[in-house]
Amino acid sequence: MALRFPRFSQGLAQDPTTRRIWFGIATAHDFESHDDITEERLYQNIFASHFGQLAIIFLWTSGNLFHVAWQGNFESWVQDPLHVRPIAHAIWDPHFGQPAVEAFTRGGALGPVNIAYSGVYQWWYTIGLRTNEDLYTGALFLLFLSAISLIAGWLHLQPKWKPSVSWFKNAESRLNHHLSGLFGVSSLAWTGHLVHVAIPASRGEYVRWNNFLDVLPHPQGLGPLFTGQWNLYAQNPDSSSHLFGTAEGAGTAILTLLGGFHPQTQSLWLTDIAHHHLAIAFIFLVAGHMYRTNFGIGHSMKDLLDAHIPPGGRLGRGHKGLYDTINNSLHFQLGLALASLGVITSLVAQHMYSLPAYAFIAQDFTTQAALYTHHQYIAGFIMTGAFAHGAIFFIRDYNPEQNEDNVLARMLDHKEAIISHLSWASLFLGFHTLGLYVHNDVMLAFGTPEKQILIEPIFAQWIQSAHGKTSYGFDVLLSSTTGPAFNAGRSIWLPGWLNAVNENSNSLFLTIGPGDFLVHHAIALGLHTTTLILVKGALDARGSKLMPDKKDFGYSFPCDGPGRGGTCDISAWDAFYLAVFWMLNTIGWVTFYWHWKHITLWQGNVSQFNESSTYLMGWLRDYLWLNSSQLINGYNPFGMNSLSVWAWMFLFGHLVWATGFMFLISWRGYWQELIETLAWAHERTPLANLIRWRDKPVALSIVQARLVGLAHFSVGYIFTYAAFLIASTSGKFG
């Protein structure tokens, strides 16, 4: 009996129903709730599992390199990045016979293949990889790192190598090591790689270990560094006629401030990127020496936070008590980490397309669309997770005595004001934005488009103008040709920036109008509503006027029994659950907007977006319906084409999405009756009744069914849009 799953909970292991399996899976990673857990074991388990996570990541990236080297066309892509389609891997068994084999044999391959829309070819090319041998070497190195990570994870579970709790709670040492070691040293190492390998490769020079010490990355070597003539490293940059990967038009500079894009690759100058990483390395190496550890000098985090008491007394005791609260709560730390990572991931999405760092990626439209969408969805899930763990912190880890009258306590004290303000903002945005869209819809329907309410986003246009965009005629700051900022920008810093901002061949500061104004406010509505639900869930997690003892019921409870009305749907988990729907909804609008604006830009018919995006029917007809036509045509009476797999995924995504509602709408009683009927039939069916199981089948709990429904809804939603996005973009641009 003792060895039944789950071993971490004897209570669950003895459960005679299938609840044992589902609750076991649900709580497998909730180490805090396991039998015999101690604080020390909790920290050690999490620490060891991080190594496992790293091993999986290294194995996965190794697999990417290996499959491209084995089955891809990297070497022929390198010869002509704009016209050869990059291959991700082969397709072993193309269904549907010869037509499928022909449809999927592309990119110069001998058999059916998948095309890569991840941007890895452009990335590897930019950082100096050129041959399949390079890719195999990288794959083997990452495989080695994966093995090392697994060994390290195992090692740190052995008694002699288990770190103590005090080691995990040494905030200053952790800050120093993460800032200097993780960010500082790795940024410096990356600068080294760019300067010694990638920049020479972009100029046609092949640097590897065998000639690494013979090839000077700069004609004067380390001379300028030691003599203080650092500006020499910026002299003679690549010319505007430079052909990437060759010596033609190449310069000798290694650290520059050119600004703008390389004319041929439409990506940031590699020498600018190296300079950026060197600056980051310097900042973080300094930052990693600021906190007090062995030598009694530097900042103490506790002293810093305790000293943060606003002089006017308007924020009470400020940050007093926060050090111990944060340092003793893994959920608080995880919440902060997820919030930061979520914002960074969304920023990655925004910057990867507007300031592309990888050569030729800007001309690979499907990859641009896929990467933007991918990073925005990831950001959404991570950000909602931040609030979930914030709520768990309030339930499990928050100590009111320790935080008396500090900023945390005051957040809880005036939560009504916070929640009602967010509610007001959401209602205002929602009614006004929908009102404008619906008004415009009606005007179009009645044949009077001139009666639409079209609002120019003048403040946003003014901000774009301040950054140098001249087409609006605002004549302010960088767009004022007579101003000192403009003149300095021409010579001292980033001379390429102003050209880039005013060129129409990139995605920097796209021209905006009334359609952008409306969808911007629709997205603002989504963001504020998602935030409202998440913030309310966290701030009410300990209790509310309706249910003052809520924290005693834990993070996820369905209701407090039948005798206490109004306690259903108000657990902190329910808030997270509802917020994920709004998050998906919002990112849907974000990605629709990005994609439609860009396909009209790439096709040269921006007027279609400008004219159709001001009313709802325009979005439905001219974006969704018009662009799904290729998708619905993946299979037709005349055979099939290379979009057929996306057509299938589009259908399959809808199916998964719709299945979600089956779990979301019907509750336990329905399923319990169905299960008992099926079990009855099973026991009376010859042959089938030879198979028996020990656990009595029971329906999922309310909370579990919601999770399963939410998972299907999310996965189906993303599958459907991914298929639409990739098929509609690749169908147009290849």
UniProtKB/Swiss-Prot annotation:
Protein name, UniProt field: Photosystem I P700 chlorophyll a apoprotein A2
The organism's place on the tree of life at top rank: Eukaryota
Organism: Solanum lycopersicum
Co-factor binding comment: P700 is a chlorophyll a/chlorophyll a' dimer, A0 is one or more chlorophyll a, A1 is one or both phylloquinones and FX is a shared 4Fe-4S iron-sulfur center.
Biological process terms in GO annotation: photosynthesis
Topological type in the membrane: Multi-pass membrane protein
Enzyme Commission number, as recorded: 1.97.1.12
Ranges annotated as spanning the membrane: 46-69, 135-158, 175-199, 273-291, 330-353, 369-395, 417-439, 517-535, 575-596, 643-665, 707-727
Sites where the protein binds phylloquinone: W671
Coiled-coil blocks: none
Subunit organization: The PsaA/B heterodimer binds the P700 chlorophyll special pair and subsequent electron acceptors. PSI consists of a core antenna complex that captures photons, and an electron transfer chain that converts photonic excitation into a charge separation. The eukaryotic PSI reaction center is composed of at least 11 subunits.
